[in-house]
Amino acid sequence: MSKIIGVKHEKAAQSAIDLGIGMQLTNIARDVHEDSKMKRIYLPANWIPNISLNNLRNIDETSFKKDETISNAIQKVISLSDKFYENGFAGLKYIPLTSRLGIFIAANVYRGIGIKIKSNKKKYFRERVYLNIFEKSLITIKSILFFIFIPFMNYQYQKIRDSFPNENI
């Protein structure tokens, strides 16, 4: 996509990859129950020890211990995604102005899903977490306001992927 929107700076690629990872991690956290119904688990096995696919599919509010383990893993995924979003934002300055706002809004909408997941730890096994039109509109307005200040914000790229030698990140 970088070539399509005219990104020429090589530092932009690292940030773009990290932004994509942040968004994908949000998807993983949001879709735990839905994915389990399709016989898929994307949470790292070492974050959910002794929890099977069947456990994920049949989780309910009465199975607190397993629910707590899954909820903690989801929280870790969201916390990790935040670090990747920050790296993505660090590279926005390299993206042409014509594409920058749209990318910033999309990233903040996805990040908003993560914030909503964090605020309701038990919702993941009842329904898919999404943002309603009001929440999306509010995030869009905030993003536009923050967008003005991006050149003055001190987003610093930090190497994250190197710190996960045993993970597929």
Regions found by a protein language model. Give the residues of each.
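Catalytic cores of Mg2+-dependent Asp-rich isoprenoid enzymes
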Residues: 2-22, 29, 33-169
